[in-house]
């Protein structure tokens, strides 16, 4: 089985800076920071080889990728005592694209993945700050729409009036 997912943080580290070609710059640097015991939130990197495999396999992801991502996500959930999609203690993650070489400003990021109409209420309760929770959700929708769905980010600015639907 090919290893597609490399974990870092929370006492586990599958990589280091020497794996830049495999993990991309961000992934290799996160692995290296975890390796030298710097405080790095737990996470994982999907290797650059997944992109190659995807295109070599008629735009299908490797069959064993999902199981590896699920296992890595479960490890994070256990480490931070939150669960992806949980209404009371939602786990929020960031998805950051990366490459073997640095390309400042060219790679996309989606923050607060895990927020939805239900989990935003759990975030508001857990944080004690409803405005923060709704603003985080708004920013997630804007980033996801722009990065993943290719919706012009200016369209979101026209709709935005307040981070809380009650304001």
Regions found by a protein language model. Name each.
Residues 51-62:
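Glycine-rich loop at the start of a catalytic domain that most often binds anionic cofactors/ligands
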Residues 60-102:
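Glycine-rich, N-terminal phosphate-binding loop and its surrounding beta-alpha-beta segment
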